[in-house]
């Protein structure tokens, strides 16, 4: 059995490994470069492999950004601010970030926001209204929704009760 720390790969082996890595799930360039460093590849080999992955459509930043934004909004119910921060953290270009934010409509965004806000407000067991408002605001801001949306919804929910 080989020791993973001492394993070396040829360019072809590493390319094959990264084709599988990128085929399994959308990846950004930063994730691929990190994986290449884990495989102890030299910079010249990294360049060859990355060019191969881009040429054969295994690696596409625009596709990654759109898929990331769509999934995080629909599944994890993240707001625009959190999505933008995460994409910037992954070193995605501003152009691709703007394209990614167009993956969901304004109506879908507001519907997700309202559903999440109402569910959070109803499920909170906090009896002190000030603590409840604080927890609600913190939760929604942590999810990445705009502060004006959060505080307008908070006023609306407080008035309903």
Regions from the PLM with identified roles:
Residues 1-161:
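An alpha-helical, amphipathic repeat domain used for nucleic-acid recognition
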